[in-house]
Amino acid sequence: MSDNDTIVAQATPPGRGGVGILRISGFKAREVAETVLGKLPKPRYADYLPFKDADGSVLDQGIALWFPGPNSFTGEDVLELQGHGGPVILDLLLKRILTIPGLRIARPGEFSERAFLNDKLDLAQAEAIADLIDASSEQAARSALNSLQGAFSARVNHLVEALTHLRIYVEAAIDFPDEEIDFLSDGKIEAQLNDVIADLDAVRAEARQGSLLREGMKVVIAGRPNAGKSSLLNALAGREAAIVTDIAGTTRDVLREHIHIDGMPLHIIDTAGLREASDEVERIGIERAWQEIEQADRVLFMVDGTTTDAVDPAEIWPEFIARLPAKLPITVVRNKADITGETLGMSEVNGHALIRLSARTGEGVDVLRNHLKQSMGFDTNMEGGFLARRRHLQALEQAAEHLQQGKAQLLGAWAGELLAEELRLAQQNLSEITGEFTSDDLLGRIFSSFCIGK
């Protein structure tokens, strides 16, 4: 298998459909056109032609599109054949194309990978293709499209350019120490560095929003049996996703629901009631519940309001609170307000949010929805956002750390050489986002998660 091979893959989903598309990219795409179509179509014009088998018989007829490189998606010669979407027809056409020597089936994401390697897309834009396909809400789709059109890359490239100018200034000060003006201590470098740090902080804030849109927030509902956890899951999901009975221990396994709150994806997880297990099945369910809790972004601690008047989680169930991971955010949810007569709404107890509601009637659930949105700092009014992946957040965080360390070197010891090195490392971190500085292993992991025809 060579990266110089001509590749072919189905670009439409498998199964039956009105249209099925095969995409070919590489230097032999021209030969495929001449062999299967009998002619080379006019570049970038739709040509209605028969698709022929090796014996000259017609396999199908449809639209052929010819994009000679470098003016194509991949930067190579690209041919697209748009025929009928029957799986048998597409399979016959694919087999016909593969009889031509030098062609092979594309690896997942190989078309996008070639576009990246041929400088048609940077890495952040290439990732945005997969994110656009996988978008689970309108806002996520719009943000992914912004990334594909270069919004995220432009912000990163602006930071890289600012760091480049700052590095030139710092290294000039190091190389010419005998000048009358001390460039390191005259305040200009500190001012420029502060500007870059402020710009980076703004990009990090937008990237966290983008990561929320892409990754979502994992919220685990936990508590004792019969506290109303499954009822709350159903209320948040807007459907009967979980079985609800008065029998303690009805939920034995983990239940998952994917919902959206004003465009923000939430992974809501209902768990088995936590207690001493009465049998092996319940024990496994409780074990899985704790595994989910340990991986959660937030825990909704469900409390049956008819069993206690306490509101402090450490007073309600100290053993449960003690076992939770450090710094895991907790929201105390006092359920069954329709029975206790408690006032619906939200307050705060010892640093924890407290919400009183009725999962059965749905009263107060909107307060919880708004709280979940606010707790992650999600801004639905932010325009022109972009999607961000975990690796993007890590690169931005590392760049910010290097800039802060560089600032400390500048202000603490006027150490120009150490500042220059921190600036170089920050620039390297940012360049990893767009792929200007990226390992082959990382590229392999990214593109292997794509669709075959992308």
UniProtKB/Swiss-Prot annotation:
Protein name per Swiss-Prot or TrEMBL: tRNA modification GTPase MnmE
InterPro entries named in the record: G_TrmE, GTP-bd, GTP-bd_TrmE_N, GTPase_MnmE, MnmE_dom2, MnmE_helical, P-loop_NTPase, Small_GTP-bd
CDD domains named among the record's database cross-references: trmE, TrmE_N
Entry annotated with the keyword Cytoplasm: yes
Gene name, Swiss-Prot/TrEMBL: mnmE
Source domain of life: Bacteria
Pfam family, one: MMR_HSR1
Regulation affecting activity: GTPase activity is strongly activated by potassium ions.
Entry keywords, A to Z: Cytoplasm, GTP-binding, Hydrolase, Magnesium, Metal-binding, Nucleotide-binding, Potassium, tRNA processing
Membership in a protein family: Belongs to the TRAFAC class TrmE-Era-EngA-EngB-Septin-like GTPase superfamily. TrmE GTPase family.
